[in-house]
């Protein structure tokens, strides 16, 4: 009986350890880690996120998606609402901003310039640097 209980306990311990050892894709609960590489695909770009306190996280996104928005949505890094102008991004890397509530919004940048297109209408350019910055 004691040997059987020891065996069962050992099996449970092994299963718990296997569950804890699962590979991390760099995104946990919609938050990409600084320096992480997330996704899979032939194209890659750098993503910078600057929060309302000035904190900056930079990570690499690999994708086969056609648009930056699709690539980030697929990884769970952004979320928002569809509008007649496209995707209104409210959450980036786990932080939600809503202009109607807090007077702040996520501004989208392409290679350091304020974007003239929305994230869901911006094609993925291999090697580009895209950014979301919290702004008033």
Each language-model region and where it sits:
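Ubiquitin-like/PB1-type beta-grasp interaction modules and other compact soluble beta-rich domains
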Residues: 2-11, 16-136
């Amino acid at each position: 009986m004691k040997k059987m209980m020891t065996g069962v306990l050992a099996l449970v311990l092994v299963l718990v350890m296997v569950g804890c050892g699962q590979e991390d894709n760099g995104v946990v609960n919609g938050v990409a880690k600084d320096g992480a590489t997330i996704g899979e695909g032939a194209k890659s770009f750098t993503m910078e996120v600057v929060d309302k306190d000035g904190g900056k996280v930079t990570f690499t996104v690999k994708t086969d998606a056609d648009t930056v928005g699709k690539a980030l949505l697929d990884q769970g890094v952004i979320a928002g609402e569809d509008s007649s102008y496209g995707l209104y991004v409210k959450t980036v890397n786990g932080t939600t901003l809503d202009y109607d509530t807090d007077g702040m919004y996520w501004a989208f940048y392409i290679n350091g310039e304020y974007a003239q297109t929305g994230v869901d209408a911006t094609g993925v350019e291999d090697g580009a640097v895209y950014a979301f910055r919290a702004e008033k």
